[in-house]
């Protein structure tokens, strides 16, 4: 894990949660205020936690301490601490802080921290094959390249890393793929997440890059299927396979849960990964099994009925993995997910999916917008997070 500490800090996310609780309490008591609220001259209520947020002050030495640990794995030097302390007013301290921040990004230590960050994000690494995907992501970050290359790069997607020098050596993945698509065709990813019907590979893509568990798509209105739950996906119910349209696994079952709520998305993605074997090598036939008795090989009809095409999302077709990569690169939710992961890492939070450490869109709105304006350059996204008020004010 990346070297981190967890200082107690108040964020805008916390404010929103507590404000919502306060509003709920007011509704239950007829709108009366408690001792936690004070009134303005015009009679409006001011929330205590909004006041506390407004009382935060810039502390660039405290921010530097955390940033140095995150970005280099070490504490700042005494000279760095004194440089900020002696800089003068807050504006001058900000300039010194940001200069140190940028200098950290040019060190071998930062490269090592990025390898650790992406290993944790991908939940894989520390062997020659399993390291290639996180090392490629780390290389893109250290070299301030675009996030889009993570899904669209056709060469150099299996680099190696020298932990001593912090240097990356480009190398192509050799797993039988004609046209690579970043980490989506990486042999380590395919081997590590091998499973029945390729669903673990699909889960990896969804959770690592969209920052949510399945179900991934929710319709504006649900549909009563006569079962225990409603159908909430925007996809037509019959757009995936089931016992009634040729599938050997009944994804149309509604007796306990509505399987199609998740599988309406999953089944449109899984066939794209189905021809990779358990070593991550691309073969000419489907290599994954079904969970049925005897573990027979899966067939296309087990995921989708005849005539149904693969896709990233409803209305976003993806005929192959390069097509999927292009679709993901163009998805603003994927970009927002990356900023959210950098945000949680900087502020010492847990994994956004595993621990439900969610980051509201409004909280990182300015950082996400800046990310798009730079062409999704990864190092610039990190700087935007580490210079935000929520990071440097205490």
What are these regions (language model features)?
Residues 43-77, 82-84:
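N-terminal module-boundary/linker segments of secreted carbohydrate-active enzymes
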Residues 1, 6, 25-54:
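Ser/Thr-rich, Pro/Gly/Ala-heavy low-complexity intrinsically disordered linkers and tails
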Residues 209-212, 245-361, 371-379, 383:
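C-terminal substrate/ligand-recognition segments
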Residues 74-104:
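Active-site-surrounding "flap" and adjacent substrate/cofactor-binding loops of secreted or lumenal enzymes
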Residues 17-26:
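Bacterial N-terminal signal peptides
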Residues 95-269, 329, 333, 351, ...:
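Extended surface/linker regions that mediate inter-domain or inter-protein docking
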Residues 28, 67-68, 73, 118, ...:
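Residue-level detector of buried hydrophobic side-chain packing
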Residues 3-18:
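Bacterial N-terminal signal peptides that target proteins for export
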